[in-house]
Every structure is written in C-alpha cells, then in structure tokens.
C-alpha cells in the first residue's frame, strides 16, 4: 500500500511539473536573459529571437572575466525536441536546419566563442580551445533543458560539425543524437591524407586538367600578376600577412585543387587554358579558390579559426614537391603565416587520437554526412567501431552535401536512422 501511495505521489508530482512549464518569455525573465531582437518569423515557429548569454572566458575560473555569447532561439513548444546548431564560426545570419524543418521542432543556434558578437573584449588565446567551447555549449544545454526537457539533437556543418564532435566528447550526456555534416577529423596541422586524396579523387582526366591549370598559372605567373593585383585592389584585398601580393598569388594557385574538389562549383570543361585572357584566368581562379582567403582582411577576421586549426583541430597544407620548379616565393606549406611569431602555436597531437578512440569505443547515435568528392572527406570519420552510429557519403558530393540534396533512397536512410535514435 505504501508503495502504491509513493507511486501515486510521484505521478502527481510529475503532472504538476508538466503543468508548471513556463512560457519562453517567463523563462527568459526568470533567468535574466534579455532579448536582443526578434527576427522575421517563419510559419514553423512561434517566435525567433536573438539573445546574449553571459559566459566565463575561462570556465575553470567562473568568477573571472566574461563575454556575451550570441544564440538564436526558434521556439515552437517545450514538449518538442530541440535541435542545437553549433555554428563553429560567427552566426551573423540565421537559418533553419533541415533537421529542424523535418522534425518541426525547436531550434537553438549557438555562435562560437571568439567569433562575431561572441568575441571577448580581450583575446586571451589560451582560452580558445575545444574544452572551453564545449563547456560553453554544455552551459547552454544545461540552462535550456529547464525549458526544453525533451530530446536534444546537436548538428553543425564543417567546423560546426567538428564542434558537435568535441562537445559530445567532453559532455557525452548532453544530447541524444549528433549529426555532423562534412566534418573532418584531422591528425596534424598538415594532414597529409589530403595529398593522397587529391591524387585519386574524381577521374584521371579531370585531375589532369586541374593540375595542368595550376602548373600553367604558376609557370606563367608574370602574365597574370597584373590582373591579380587589379582584381585584388578592386575588392580591397591586401596581402601583407601572407608575405606580399606575389606570394599570395602562389598560395591561391596552390589552393586551387583543394577548393576545386571541396566545392565542386565548376566542371572541368570550364577550366580555361592558355588561350584565355589574363582577366579570365583570374576571374576563374577566384571563383574556385577565393582570393579573399589569403587576404589580410580575411585572416584577421578568422584568426580564431586558424588558431584552433593550428593548436587542436588540425588543418592541411600544400604538396610543394609537385610544383617546386614553378614556385618563386612560397616555401612554407602550412598556415603558420596567419599569426605573428609572438603567439605560441603548439599543436596538441593527442586530442584527435583521443577523439577517434571515443568514436570507436563509446560514441553512439551519430549520423556523419560527407560528400564523396569533398576534399575534407580525405580526413572524414570512417571508423566507429561497433557503435550504432551511421556514416553516409553522397556519391559525387561536395562540401555542400546536405541530407536534402542526397539521392531519395539515401535521404530516407538518414531520416530512418535519425528516427530510430529518437525513439
């Protein structure tokens, strides 16, 4: 009888707790969170708002200096799941994840520390690491689970997808399902698996055309430099950090093959040859490789990204041996030029090994999504041990691979896996 009474009391308590669910406005008011602005709504959501959450710069010293972290809340109903989108970079624009749209549920998008509005007044580089960022996300999950007690799904694209992995590596109980898109797991500041990938991706004919263009652009760089300079001046790009305009030009040519396969914007039949005008060569190269990537303007804005790549997340470089006889300026294949020598860049080689071990032995409920031809698939997660997790490669896919542009059958497989993890 006593057991029945206790069970009944527990049910009443749970029912009262359910009745006590507060509105979004009440929750924000209780937590002292101020709305920055309301975004134009979509029919899916009751409201979409931007708010700022106070976070310690150093979570090991919670009473020390703090910064405000930007998040977007897309609210439907507390009884529905939440998709947490980890931006990885700034979150200067809002978007609805395709998973959120599929589930018609709540969404929280989180801007990464040291980017956009989530940049501290002082840049203490030692506090820009994967644990600090994961703890930012842990604090947000812990806070908003009071409002949204149902299942949580974390997802992100590219570096945002890496952020998903690191968050669950440090805090495996925070979310129920993880969906990283096109997220590499790199094992060094120059992961040489990239070179092997570029030697085998696509068809031999297409690879030859890509390499032929690079050799032409380097061998005849004197013919194209004026057009490169004119284009850069028009865009407002400067290249002091890279080492000057001539060096930047060579880096752009070296980047061409990586970017060509990463994005898949231009078919090989559109690659220009020697007969093309200098301006056409430069326009094409910019469309594929993006000259802004080596500009002072880009490097300064995205220096937090380069710091993470060069200290924990790993990155890529260029196989200079292939083009050695054509290079006049570049002799460093990696991106250490993005920082002054006064900033210590020491790479933590053990972290990626530990993350891979976690994915092999402990991780569950992951859905990894990659594009077959995306250069970042060279360092994709391909080993998950006996986990129930799933890995999907879209045939011929690029870094733009998403669930909704997969073939119908594969798309159904992804959403079937997602549904099984949520039930």
Predicted features and spans:
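Glycine-rich nucleophile elbow surrounding the catalytic serine of serine-hydrolase chemistry
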Residues: 156-166
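Bacterial Sec-dependent N-terminal signal peptides
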Residues: 1-23, 198-206
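Alpha/beta-hydrolase
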Residues: 166-305
